[in-house]
Amino acid sequence: MTSNVSGKAYALTLMCPIKGGTDNNNVAFADAIRDQLENWNAMATSPMARTPNTYLCRYYILDDVCTQSLPGAGIWDTISDILPMMPAKWRLAALPYEDHLKSRYLVFSSNFHGELEPYLQGIWRSAETDIRSIWRHCYGFDGVSDAATFIDYARRCQLDTSLFFVGSNDDSLAAQLKALYVKQEFSRFAQQTQDLPAAQLRQAYLQFMHRVKPRDDAGPSWTAGQRA
């Protein structure tokens, strides 16, 4: 597996710096983006459900990098125990240097089927209005006017990715939606027929297979963005 690619699956990570400042409601640009993303959660289906071939995607705002703790098993352990008793300027001087981001970032992470450019074209064509509203406060997005410039912008913000969503393989989105549908329907079938005698169970199973059509991806299935 190379960076970003595993078979026919692609893992995309974009980190897009957000401009400082506020909108017309005096809300910081990063917070305005966060509020809009929260509003997507209230929709029956996310705008990203319209984008072709998306297995799973996530947006979030990265405010800063976090220092979780001091290094273990060293002299800093002892010093950190007595730091609360020290004057403030001594405490700050004793702490290790911390890195911080110069901007807040809009992070977009997606696992999808296929190649990068057709996928980004699909995002733009199916959700251009939503994409503009989310990214408009990011540095560099002012130059995006069509699918081609959106692809160029995304490539400038892209980070190599080697970790994929473990709940998915590299089959087509239609095949994976079908598999989820069959799994759900078979669980329901097993629950409803567990007390049937053998002859009736066999007949019920044949009816189940005829209705579900497990080998037909174009037959009954889940829809993209569907909640179980």
Question: For the regions a protein language model found, what residue spans apply to each?
Answer:
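Short S/T/G/P-rich N-terminal loop/turn motif that feeds into the first structured element of a domain
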Residues: 1-94, 100-105, 111-114, 150-228
